[in-house]
């Protein structure tokens, strides 16, 4: 089951969810899991859980972003395991969520494997990250 839990449940289960998001947040260094929880509590982010009978298998952080000409659902972070169990349902749930929120599409910044896992999704531009002072000439 893929769902957006109520905030009180999210807080109660945070000690299970936070470690799942840690590896993903460390890739960018821009967020820690607690930053995502604060954002969820303020209504900025959605932190979804992907569950099986064994408990929470994964967590997905989303944000609806309004640009001047379109609204998109950004998949910010995904962490956890057992992807084969929840990914097909997650694609359906997030497509429905994005559509009902008036989004034009879903976007994510992630490793290349996500394009394959997402099933036929096209990749866009390359994101170039350069630390200040790291210019090589």
Which sequence ranges carry the predicted segments?
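Active-site/acyl-donor-binding loops of N-acyltransferases
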Residues: 108-137
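Conserved donor-binding loop and adjoining core beta-sheet/short helix segment
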Residues: 42-84
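Active-site rim helix/loop that mediates acceptor-substrate recognition in acyltransferases
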Residues: 26-47
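Long, low-complexity, intrinsically disordered polar/charged segments
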Residues: 22-23, 27-30, 68-77, 129-136
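Intrinsically disordered, low-complexity terminal regulatory regions
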Residues: 2, 19, 38-40, 75
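Acyl-donor binding region in acyl/amide transferases
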Residues: 68-119
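Short amphipathic alpha-helix that is part of the acyltransferase structural core
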Residues: 1-31
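Generic structural motif
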Residues: 1-5, 60, 120-121
């Amino acid at each position: 089951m893929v769902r957006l839990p109520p905030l009180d449940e999210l807080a109660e289960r945070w000690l299970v969810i936070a470690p799942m998001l840690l590896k993903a947040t460390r890739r960018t260094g821009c967020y820690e899991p607690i930053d995502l929880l604060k954002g969820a509590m303020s209504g900025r982010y959605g932190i979804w859980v992907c569950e099986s009978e064994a408990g929470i298998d994964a967590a997905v952080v989303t944000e609806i972003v309004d640009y001047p000409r379109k609204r998109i659902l950004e998949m910010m972070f995904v962490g956890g395991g057992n992807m084969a169990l929840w990914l097909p349902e997650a694609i359906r749930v997030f497509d429905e969520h994005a559509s009902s929120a008036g989004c034009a599409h879903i976007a994510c910044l992630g490793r290349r494997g996500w394009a394959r896992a997402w099933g036929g999704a096209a990749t866009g531009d390359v994101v170039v990250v350069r630390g200040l002072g790291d210019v090589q000439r």
